[in-house]
Amino acid sequence: MKKIILTIFLILGVVSFAAPKYVDKVKLQKNSYQIIQDEADVFLFGKSTEDVGLTVGIYNIQENNDMAKKISEEVKTGAPAEQKFVSSRENKRAYVNKFKANDGSYTYSIVAKKTKIKNCYISIIYITAKDFKDNELDKVVDKTLNEVESYLK
């Protein structure tokens, strides 16, 4: 009996620490997002519409030395072979890498420079058929970051 109770407490302890407390999972699911990975330091979710595929990673990383830029560089160097790197830029809110796939679609990697939560880093993969120019891309980045940040408590 003691082992059963201990096991239940251990399981509840693991479950309660699995997702970052600052992510509103109920709101995510209400807005048709699917939770892909739910761990203490990595939380991934995404959704696909007719025009856009969106995957978001929220990372809890204790290091602060320009981590957002490092994450952006990692995305660039770790991209799949079928994704051809096109360009890189940054605006006030994010580092953005642009890739073109063999099928003609475009993938935009968006890494937020700062978030309202300490040690929280947001990385977004935005896939679309559209080839955004700089001004258009800035609007997409702002809109997407605003939406993702709305799921943070």
List the predicted regions and their residue ranges.
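Hydrophobic h-region of N-terminal signal peptides that target proteins for export
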Residues: L6-F17
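Surface-exposed amphipathic alpha-helical segments
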Residues: D24-Q34, I124-K153
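Amphipathic alpha-helical segments
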Residues: K21-I35, M67-A79
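A short acidic-to-branched-hydrophobic micro-motif
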Residues: F43-I71, Y121-I127
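Short, solvent-exposed coil/turn segments at beta-strand boundaries
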Residues: L28-N31, K47-D51, E90-K92, K113-Y121
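Signature of long, low-cysteine stretches enriched in small and polar/charged residues
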Residues: G78-I117
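Short, surface-exposed coil-to-beta transition loops
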Residues: D38-V42, G53, D103-V111, C120-Y121
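Positively charged n-region of N-terminal signal peptides that target proteins for export
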Residues: M1-I4
